């Protein structure tokens, strides 16, 4: 069956790459078929597997299609796909270093390598997480714990006033859910205005912190985003770090997407200042070509990480705060997530993965030049691989245009709002996007006006 599945994947790959990017499935018909699985009698696994592959071929946005220019989701590299199979075969439990010493050490090795790349000190530590939201939640918990030792036992009641933390209006809005989850309420998040170009305004940040303090609130954390979701912008890292240090606040860099620039020598200077962070989030599943669910939380405060997530029980095989993941992270039971990035880095090296990241930037530059030549207007000036553009008036309203492009199936882009303006958002993360894929995207965007096929 394993050989059959490998052949099926090999047969499907060219069909997916050449086929429509958006789902084409009839969901009513699918639900009718799905109701046939009543679980009252066993079915042959081969038939169930074949049926599932058919539904997946037509029932998802195909992020492995090189004409997917959408959100921060890459085509997964083959080594990362293999890592999932290895992890599933051995199925290690990474809660404890005693039960899974090799997987835990592999993950720690990758975390240390990424921390070194970011310029953090030799004592930096961290862990893999299911996504950027979990990693960012970890940052908030550490910030609250650092701000008041009583937070661990008393929660928000330990503070003399309501805790507050700060990030740009262009941030990933999952921060609202994170504040809710942490028990400090969504009003704890202060969204700071930009300076007009998609980057947080440090002067507005300083004013907000001062006003909150004057009103009796307790500022605890400043978050700078390195690669905003809408425009791919990088907040002023040094400016944010200066304000955080002056106010004795935790400084976190949400580099979930843009952190991949650390792999590329030409792009690393864009993240100058990240080395001053108390903690960093990087999602390998955004731009480092792993499968989904592979994020990293990195911090230079290992002792605080253990303090925030410590627990004591007699049934675990070990209780080493520095090395047992269940004692220094949100999760208890854990999958071997880090093997995906280990395989990618081991087989490509920093040079190879850096070339992958730089190639994405070059792809977006090619798209930009082609669209500008056709009368489109660029709305953002990201040095990374996100392009926000406004179509010529003759093409109509942005969201209607995007719906037409997606429905046609030749490419996938997204609408968003950047600095109060609706734009077509184009992002390149796929390692095999070709000149013909770029041409297909441009033709799809231009088609309503020109009528070209």
Q: Language-model segments: what does each one mean?
A:
Residues 102-103, 126-133, 167-168, 225, ...:
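Active-site nucleophile and cofactor-binding loops and adjacent substrate-binding regions
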Residues 377-405:
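Conserved PLP-binding catalytic core of the aspartate aminotransferase-like
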Residues 1-123, 424-427, 433, 444-445:
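N-terminal entrance/gating region of PLP-dependent enzymes' catalytic architecture
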Residues 135, 141-306:
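Conserved PLP-enzyme active-site core in the AAT-like
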Residues 114-142, 190-193:
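Short loop-beta-helix segment that forms the pyridoxal 5′-phosphate
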Residues 381-386, 408-425:
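Conserved PLP cofactor-binding pocket of PLP-dependent enzymes
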Residues 228, 272-374, 379:
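Active-site C-terminal subdomain of aminotransferase-like
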């Amino acid at each position: 069956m394993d050989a059959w599945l490998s052949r099926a994947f090999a047969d499907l790959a060219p069909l997916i790459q050449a086929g429509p990017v958006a789902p084409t499935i009839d969901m009513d018909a699918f639900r009718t078929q799905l109701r046939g699985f009543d679980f009252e009698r066993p079915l042959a696994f081969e038939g169930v597997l074949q049926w599932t592959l058919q539904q997946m071929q037509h029932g998802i946005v195909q992020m492995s299609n090189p004409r997917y220019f959408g959100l921060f989701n890459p085509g997964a590299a083959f080594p990362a796909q293999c890592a999932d199979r290895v992890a599933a075969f051995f199925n290690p439990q990474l809660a404890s270093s005693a039960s899974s010493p090799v997987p835990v050490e592999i993950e720690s090795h990758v975390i240390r390598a990424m921390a070194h790349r970011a310029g953090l000190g030799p004592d930096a530590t961290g862990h893999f997480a299911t996504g950027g939201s979990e990693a960012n939640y970890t940052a908030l918990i550490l910030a609250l714990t650092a701000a008041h030792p009583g937070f661990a036992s008393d929660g928000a009641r330990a503070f003399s006033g309501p805790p507050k933390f700060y990030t740009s209006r262009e941030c990933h809005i999952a921060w609202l859910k994170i504040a809710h989850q942490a028990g400090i309420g969504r009003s704890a998040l202060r969204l700071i205005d930009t300076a007009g170009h998609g980057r947080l305004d440090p002067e507005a940040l300083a004013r907000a912190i001062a006003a909150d303090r004057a009103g009796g609130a307790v500022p605890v954390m400043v978050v700078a985003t390195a690669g905003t979701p809408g425009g791919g912008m990088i907040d002023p890292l040094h400016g944010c770090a200066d304000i955080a240090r002056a106010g004795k606040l935790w400084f976190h860099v949400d580099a979930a997407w843009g952190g991949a620039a650390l792999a590329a020598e030409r792009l690393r200077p864009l993240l100058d200042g990240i080395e001053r962070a108390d903690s960093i989030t990087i999602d390998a599943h955004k731009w480092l070509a792993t499968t989904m669910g592979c994020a990293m939380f990195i911090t230079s405060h290992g002792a605080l990480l253990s303090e925030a997530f410590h627990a004591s029980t007699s049934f675990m095989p070990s209780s080493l705060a520095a090395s047992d993941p269940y004692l220094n992270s949100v999760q208890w039971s854990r999958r071997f997530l880090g093997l995906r990035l280990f395989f990618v880095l081991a087989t490509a090296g920093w040079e190879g993965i850096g070339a992958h990241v730089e190639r994405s930037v070059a792809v977006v530059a090619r798209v930009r030049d082609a669209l500008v030549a056709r009368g489109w207007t660029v709305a953002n000036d990201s040095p990374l691989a996100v392009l926000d553009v406004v179509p010529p008036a003759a093409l109509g309203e942005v969201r209607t245009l995007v719906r037409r492009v997606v429905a046609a199936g030749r490419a996938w882009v997204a609408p968003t709002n950047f600095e109060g303006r609706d734009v077509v958002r184009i992002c390149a993360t796929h390692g095999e996007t070709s000149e013909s894929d770029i041409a297909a995207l441009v033709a799809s965007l231009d088609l309503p006006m020109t009528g070209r096929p």
